[in-house]
Amino acid sequence: MRDVIMIPISNDEDLVIAADNSGGVGQKMFDYVKVDYETVAYYGLRVALSECLTVGAKPLAIVMQNLIGEEEWSHLQKGCQTLFSELKCEPIPITGSTESNFKMVQSAFAIMVIGKVRKADIKVRKTPSHAKFACIGKPLCGGEVIEKKHEIGPLPIIKKLLELPYVFEIVPIGSKGVQYEWKKLCEENKLDYCQITSTEIDITKSAGPATCFLISFHPDRTEDIAKAAGGHFFQLNTK
C-alpha cells in the first residue's frame, strides 16, 4: 500500500491521512542541511500533500508538529502558503503544536495532511498489465533539492495528470527510489514484470522530499503524457 492510511468513515467515503517529517534540516547549529524554515515546511507539505492527492483524496486539514521554536511558526505557515499559491488552490486550515519549553540545538519538524476520498475515486490498484511507466521529475536529495530544484517534478503538473483518464496511477517517490516503488506497484496490481531500466535517471537513488513521481499510463498516450510533463518526463523500460 501507499504511505497513507485510509479509514472508512461511511459506506461511500474514506478518511485519508498522510505525513512527513524532517530532522537536521534548517538553521540550527547542528543541522546537516542549512535552509530557511519556509523551505522546510514547503517540502514537508509537498510530500504529505502528494501522498494524499495521488490516491484521489481532497485535503481538508493540515497538522504541523514544530520542534524548532515558537518564532518559526509563522515561517512554517508561510512555506505552506507558498505551495497553496503554486497549486492555485484555497488555503487548507492549519493547526498543530510547538515545543516552547526547551530550546532545540537541531531542527525537527513533522506535518500531517488529513483528507477525504470517495471509495469509487480511490486511485490505487488501477494499473493494468498493458500499462507503460515513466518518471516525472528527477530523484534528488539533500542539498541537491535546493541546487537543482528546476529538475523537481512540479506538483501542479502532477495535479493535472491526475485528472487525465488515461493516467492509471501516480506514486510519489521517497528515500527508497523509483525501482522500489515500481516493484511495490507491480505487486499491488499483480503484474509480472521483472525489472525496469532507465538511461536518463538513477532508479535506485533517494528522491528525498518526493522530487519525482512514478506514473503508469495507457501505452497509446505516451506523447500526450510527455507533452503535459514538459521536460520532466523520463520513460521507464520494462522487462
Which ranges hold each PLM region?
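Helix-biased detector of long, well-ordered alpha-helical tracts
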Residues: 1-239
